[in-house]
């Protein structure tokens, strides 16, 4: 990438600040700050969907995420729901594809992941709701669906317990497939969840999949809600991409989308 292309890409970056505000990342200094943590969020692969090149979509995403890892280490990758498209027979093949990732990865259940809980947990060795701590940062993963593919709000009781357990941690990142705010056609209005998370000032961002046509950062109660486009499926943004998140040494969070080769829509939170 030449200097003009780099500066053009930088102008699209976003920085997420600890007070919930977002600002454009206007200069190279935003990228020059050292990272304390770096991860990728992807979603909506829809492995097995008819009349789509789902195997190619997964192959491209895995290769490009691994390329990011080679460029600068990724501590983890999150696949935020709709790994498969309805048919549980495709679950083993989708896992084999994601096993090509060269960093630890975690998954959440989406509405098209229509798999019995015991099969899901047996396949991924992960619960439907679970937490992980990476470099003293908390990651909370929650289901927003079930074997029927119903749209569900996150498990508020579970999240309340975990947010209270981790209230003294500096940063909490939350991952749920369906956006819990009704600001998109496919979102749902989870008022109890919204009221819960705003009580915890260490919640740095809530990451959503599901809405293939969404690529922005939205703010509610000073909490950023981040979308990541889609890596598969038959609709959505013209590109198939994923989100990169970089926690800086000063605790700013720089985030941008890869489409999946070029950097776009960067922000700091």
Predicted features by range, described:
Residues 40-60, 85, 114-124, 147-153, ...:
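Acidic/histidine-rich helix-loop elements
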Residues 44, 81-82, 110, 177, ...:
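Active-site glycine-centered loops adjacent to acidic/histidine catalytic or metal-binding residues
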Residues 32, 47, 121-188, 257-260:
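Conserved catalytic scaffold of divalent metal-dependent phosphoesterases
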Residues 1-17, 21:
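N-terminal secretory signal peptides and thylakoid transit peptides that target proteins
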Residues 80-99, 115-125, 184-187, 216-221:
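Metal-dependent catalytic neighborhoods of phosphoester/phosphodiester hydrolases
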Residues 33, 53-55, 59-60, 64, ...:
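Binuclear metal-dependent phosphoesterase catalytic core
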Residues 67-76, 149-224:
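His/acidic metal-ligating clusters that form di-metal
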Residues 18-92:
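N-terminal active-site segment of His-dependent metallophosphoesterases
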């Amino acid at each position: 990438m030449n200097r003009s292309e780099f500066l053009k890409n930088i102008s699209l970056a976003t920085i997420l600040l600890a007070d919930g505000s977002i600002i454009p990342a206007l200069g190279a200094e935003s990228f020059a700050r050292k990272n304390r943590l770096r991860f990728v969020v992807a979603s909506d692969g829809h492995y097995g969907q008819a009349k789509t090149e789902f195997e190619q979509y997964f192959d491209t995403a895995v290769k490009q995420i691994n390329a990011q890892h080679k460029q600068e280490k990724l501590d983890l990758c999150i696949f935020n729901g709709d790994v498969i498209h309805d048919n549980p027979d495709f679950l083993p093949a989708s896992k084999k594809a994601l096993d090509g990732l060269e960093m630890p990865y975690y998954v959440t259940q989406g509405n098209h992941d229509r798999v019995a809980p015991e099969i899901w947990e047996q396949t991924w060795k992960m619960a439907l709701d679970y937490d992980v701590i990476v470099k003293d940062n908390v990651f909370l993963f929650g289901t927003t669906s079930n074997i029927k593919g119903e749209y569900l709000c996150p498990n508020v009781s579970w999240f309340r317990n975990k947010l209270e357990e981790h209230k003294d941690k500096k940063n909490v990142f939350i991952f749920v497939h369906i956006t819990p705010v009704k600001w998109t056609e496919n979102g749902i209005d989870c008022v109890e969840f919204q009221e819960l998370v705003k009580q915890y000032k260490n919640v740095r961002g809530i990451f959503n999949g599901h809405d293939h046509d969404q690529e922005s950062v939205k703010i509610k109660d000073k909490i950023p809600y981040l979308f990541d486009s889609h890596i598969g499926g038959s609709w959505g943004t013209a590109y198939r991409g994923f989100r990169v998140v970089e926690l800086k040494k000063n605790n700013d969070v720089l985030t941008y989308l890869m489409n999946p080769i070029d950097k776009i829509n960067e922000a700091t939170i």
